[in-house]
A protein has these predicted regions:
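A short, polar/proline- and glycine-enriched secondary-structure boundary/capping micro-motif
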Residues: 48, 91-92, 120-123
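Short solvent-exposed loop/turn micro-motifs enriched in small/polar/acidic residues
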Residues: 63-65, 93-96
Length: 123
């Protein structure tokens, strides 16, 4: 297993990166080629779909920053952590959740299942 802390840091960084080229580079480093993301609102597989999903979330919640708000728990090839988003002058509402990750053999994320707490209504 690669360094789990680096993988989770990359995951959070991807959600915060507004530049599409840099975000795609982060996704390529942290997600397996056929990696997937699933929560109650989204289902995305592959780097292009994950990038498009993150861009759509950034458009819906402009100015929000994602932060790790728990320790990272890991065993075998599984990882769990909690996060929050919001908190800038233009985005005072917070929401958060917990993500469960299965890592691929190369240590990158294979599958992320997200459980999001109540999200604020925007626009």
């Amino acid at each position: 297993m690669s360094n789990v802390n680096e993988i989770v840091a990359g995951y959070i960084a991807a959600w915060n990166e507004a530049d599409g080229g840099r975000r795609r580079d982060i996704i390529a480093r942290t997600w397996s080629d056929d990696g997937s993301y699933l929560d109650s609102h989204r289902d995305s597989t592959g780097h292009a779909a994950i990038d498009a999903m993150i861009a759509a979330v950034q458009e819906r919640f402009p100015g929000y920053r994602f932060r790790l708000c728990s320790g990272i728990e890991a065993h075998h090839n599984r990882v769990r952590f909690s996060w929050s988003a919001g908190g800038t002058d233009h985005a005072p509402l917070f929401f958060g959740g917990t993500d469960f990750v299965a890592l691929a053999a190369d240590g990158r994320m294979q599958a992320v299942t997200g459980f999001t707490d109540a999200m604020p209504s925007v626009g």
